[in-house]
Design a protein with these regions (language model features):
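Alpha-helical solenoid repeat scaffolds
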Residues: 1-196
């Protein structure tokens, strides 16, 4: 369900207020473990909103708490990036890439930063897919998934539009190799062939 900004604003305000109540309560009762559960529940509620929206209004307090508790992992950054990329949301990716500027001395992981820049570039310049697709894919050691696969898969149709139509007998062969390298499944490959 797509949320209207006004609705989002209300949701953030409610979550922030709930979190403040829990924080106030926890100073009074230090032994209260249900309190921690409530706080985590509020933060995971916030995380869902963060993952599914390019930008959240007035979320500074929740974001900072969520971030300081290790909520913003590379895996979640890629999950959000994939959602934004699928919507061709360059602005959303820019916001995501600059998020850590809110925290003093916080630095984005270099590889993550490079990938976020790559996604923005592929949305702005789909012709650059060729350079990316001909590289060997990086496999994430933790998840065993190809890190930038979604960007390659989703950029293909846009890339094709950048190729001049007067090319001599275009053939799908070079793209077969890309599909192999990036381990496309049958559905993804079929989508590519349809786009071609």
């Amino acid at each position: 369900a797509k949320l209207t900004p006004n609705n989002l604003e209300t949701q953030i305000a409610v979550l922030t207020a709930k979190y403040q109540v829990e924080t106030t309560n926890s100073t009074q009762a230090t032994e209260n473990s249900s309190n921690d559960k409530n706080k985590s529940a509020i933060l995971s509620e916030y995380e869902k909103l963060w993952l599914n929206n390019a930008e959240l209004p007035n979320d500074a307090q929740l974001w900072t708490t969520w971030y300081s508790q290790g909520g913003r992992t590379p895996e979640k950054i890629y999950q959000k990036a994939e959602m934004l990329f699928g919507k061709s949301d360059v602005k959303g990716l820019e916001i995501l890439a600059k998020e850590l500027e809110k925290i003093e001395n916080a630095k984005e992981d270099e590889q993550v930063a490079a990938h976020l820049a790559l996604y923005q570039d592929l949305l702005k310049n789909p012709a650059n897919l060729k350079i990316q697709a001909e590289k060997l894919p990086l496999i994430d050691a933790n998840t065993n998934k190809i890190t930038n696969k979604f960007a390659v898969v989703l950029s293909f149709a846009r890339y094709l539009r950048t190729i001049p139509e007067n090319m001599n007998e275009p053939t799908f062969t070079p793209y077969e190799q890309w599909a192999k390298t990036w381990q496309l499944n049958e559905t993804e490959l079929r989508d590519w062939k349809i786009a071609f």
